[in-house]
């Protein structure tokens, strides 16, 4: 497995997979209550470790090898239980570290600032000061009311995307690339430059006990990431998705659909998903809904009843809802003649396409 560094949440799915390694998931039944419960608890333990340990490695010493070790995973597996955790459990203990307990501080005292407030503040700070020399009229679109009015009308009618973008590419030589670019709607633009400001600093923490606490020159631990999987030493699968804290959850579920239930790639992507929101959001003010699971509609039946009996609060969503990610994936297979075959899948939860030539 390959993923982004600890300045992202890329390790989260790998840690959860490690915690699940000794569980025969296939025998539990796909998307059964027992399966959803076990995968959810593995994810919640991994998210606790994400928030406890992961951050920009230029500023924080991250115990990567320990977090991915079998010994550490064995200790984390001992936390599995029959009923829902409720609040996010604490991170695991590693000698020499004092990890941040995100579950104990969800929401905390950290305050969010609205996008509109941020834009107003930034525009005020970035607006050029008018001097006699700078007051010379120039064409910037604002001097043409009719053009400006038409632009405003067009923007009012535009459906603005609310999510990260994703792109997965494999060429004829088998080279694999996945990119997950992301800035949110209404990213502030510096007047006169055409350049938008990044706004991922909302994924920093203000709590000084967090490894992801804001600092000059430091990268926030961001949610966008991708996963690449090799099989028998050769590239096999590459995939990513938008979705914030759902990203690791969606990628893990798709991979388990392939590995534990032997689904075809598009089937694995289409299959109903679930989402824990016990995890404090990566976005300020880092709110959480302890013990709450979101389920796509097809899971809202016997599975939901059994999960409720385990102590989960459940929220139903329509099938193929974009709150559950939008995975793009490519698998490299070899046919009987040794020719490389590329199998691509696009998630119906967003405007996602798969194409080849």
Where are these regions (language model features)?
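Internal maturation/activation junctions in enzymes
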Residues: 25-182, 192-193
């Amino acid at each position: 497995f390959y993923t982004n560094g600890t300045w992202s949440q890329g390790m989260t799915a790998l840690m959860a997979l490690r915690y699940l390694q000794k569980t025969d998931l296939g025998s539990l039944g796909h998307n059964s209550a027992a399966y959803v419960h076990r995968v959810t608890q593995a994810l919640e333990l991994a998210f606790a470790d994400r928030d406890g340990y992961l951050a920009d490695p230029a500023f924080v010493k991250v115990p990567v090898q320990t977090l991915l070790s079998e010994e550490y995973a064995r200790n984390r597996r001992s936390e599995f239980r029959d009923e829902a955790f409720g609040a996010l459990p604490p991170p695991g203990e590693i000698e020499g570290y004092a990890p941040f307990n995100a579950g104990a501080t969800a929401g905390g005292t950290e305050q969010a600032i609205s996008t509109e407030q941020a834009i107003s503040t930034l525009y005020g700070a970035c607006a050029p000061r008018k001097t006699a020399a700078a007051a010379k009229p120039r064409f910037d679109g604002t001097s043409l009311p009719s053009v400006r009015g038409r632009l405003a009308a067009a923007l009012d009618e535009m459906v603005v995307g609310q999510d990260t973008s994703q792109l997965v590419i494999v060429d004829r030589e088998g080279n694999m690339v996945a990119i997950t670019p992301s800035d949110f709607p209404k990213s502030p633009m510096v007047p006169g430059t055409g350049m938008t400001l990044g706004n991922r600093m909302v994924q920093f923490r203000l709590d000084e006990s967090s490894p992801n606490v804001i600092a000059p020159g430091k990268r926030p631990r961001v949610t966008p990431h991708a996963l690449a999987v090799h099989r028998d030493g050769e590239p096999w699968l590459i995939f990513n998705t938008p979705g914030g804290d759902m990203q690791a959850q969606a990628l893990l579920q798709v991979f388990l659909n392939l590995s534990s239930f032997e689904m075809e790639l598009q089937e694995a992507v289409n299959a109903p998903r679930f989402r824990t929101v016990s995890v404090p959001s990566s976005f300020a003010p880092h709110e959480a809904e302890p013990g709450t699971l979101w389920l796509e509609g097809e899971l809202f039946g016997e599975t939901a009843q059994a999960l409720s009996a385990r102590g989960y609060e459940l929220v139903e969503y329509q099938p193929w809802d974009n709150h559950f990610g939008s995975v793009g994936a490519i698998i490299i297979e070899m046919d009987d003649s040794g020719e490389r075959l590329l199998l691509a899948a696009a998630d119906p939860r967003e405007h996602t396409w798969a194409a080849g030539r």
